Amino acid sequence: IRVEKEPEYSHTDLRFTATTYNCERYYNVELKERNRGSDEYAEVPLKLSKYIDILNSTKDDENAFIFYIMPTEIWIFNLSKLDLNKVRLVNWEIKSVQYSENSRIIRTPTMFIPLRMACWNTIRK
């Protein structure tokens, strides 16, 4: 595996190449950390604009993935193969500045991806 960190202005966090005996696979990956585990909810949020940015920054020979890293588990979704008919889309009320108490609320188109759509998950140790 060869891992490349993306520049700060990039839409994703890293790219990596996985090499086997007969081929190479290329991946464009976004990492999201969450303070709560899947026992508290059955979906993970992803802003629609972020989803579009990730797909637009993914090269033709790459697959786009998003990793949700939670306190006790990791959930991985293949955004290149995500069935949008099974994803809930809502105008979610989000603070314009995430960690500010005085921030105004903005209605933001957000996808809520069911955890059951993950292509892989594991328990963190």
Language-model region placement:
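An acidic- and aromatic-residue-enriched active-site/binding cleft used to recognize and process polar
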Residues: E8, K32-R34, P71
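Short connector loops at helix/strand junctions that flank enzyme active sites
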Residues: Y9-H11, E24-N28, K59-D61
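Mg2+/Mn2+-dependent nuclease catalytic core
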Residues: R34-T58
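A short acidic/basic microdomain associated with nuclease active sites
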Residues: I1-T20
